[in-house]
Regions:
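Redox-cofactor binding/interface segments in oxidoreductases and associated redox assembly factors
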Residues: 75-76, 104
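Residue-level "edge-of-site" marker
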Residues: 34-36, 80, 105, 133-134
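N-terminal beta1-alpha1-beta2 submodule of the flavodoxin-like/Rossmannoid cofactor-binding fold
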Residues: 1-75, 82-89, 93, 146-161
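Generic internal hydrophobic packing segments that stabilize the cores of diverse globular domains
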Residues: 85-89, 99, 117
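Short glycine-rich anion-binding loops that position phosphate/pyrophosphate groups of nucleotides
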Residues: 78-81, 109
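A generic structural signal for alpha->beta connector loops
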Residues: 1-3, 27, 99, 125-128
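Short, conserved loop/helix-junction motifs that constitute active-site signature segments
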Residues: 67, 93-100, 123-126
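Short, glycine-/small-residue-rich phosphate/pyrophosphate-handling segment
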Residues: 103-143
Length: 161
């Protein structure tokens, strides 16, 4: 069994930056969730908010990595209108029975991240070994490193226990 897989969706790049940081620091595989249509511009923003509010699970491309092959799956999503992104909702719906241990993170421009992390855990049907919510402004200023170190230490600690 492989140690860890980081799976994320990112529309603006914030969640991608965090996911790649975690994967690099933890020596984990990293896989973006790919969807069938783009979310660019105002219409992409509007569509994202509408799907999040409706809690839609949309069509996504098949994953190349099987979460069942990993001891830990780290899931990352942006906060959209106070909810997890619809691509992440679709990924969890498709793979939640394949998860062993999970860790969760979210990025946000505003608020709602803690609620999103609880919703993700409930939707996965298990308690995460670690969670963290990062503000886009923290990421822009490079202030997210300390929170990520604590996040990764928490899931590494749970692995040793």
């Amino acid at each position: 069994m492989k140690p860890a897989l980081v799976v994320y969706f990112s529309r603006t790049g914030y969640t991608q930056r965090v996911a790649e940081h975690i994967a690099h620091a933890a020596g984990a595989d990293c896989e973006p969730i790919k969807e069938r249509s783009a979310r660019t511009g105002f219409l992409g923003y509007w569509r994202s908010a509408r799907e999040a509010l409706r809690k839609s699970a949309i069509e996504i491309e098949p994953a190349s990595a099987n979460p069942r092959d990993y001891a830990l799956v780290v899931l990352g999503t942006p906060v959209w209108a106070g909810n997890m992104s619809s691509p992440m909702r679709a990924y969890i719906a498709r793979h939640k029975l394949d998860f062993g241990r999970i860790a969760l993170f979210c990025t946000q421009g505003g608020s709602g991240g803690e609620k999103v992390l609880r919703t993700m855990a409930d939707f996965c049907g298990r308690s995460p070994v670690a969670t963290v919510c990062l503000n886009d402004s923290e990421i822009d200023r490079g202030l997210h490193g300390v929170k990520l170190q604590a996040f990764m230490a928490a899931f590494a600690e749970r692995k040793a226990a």
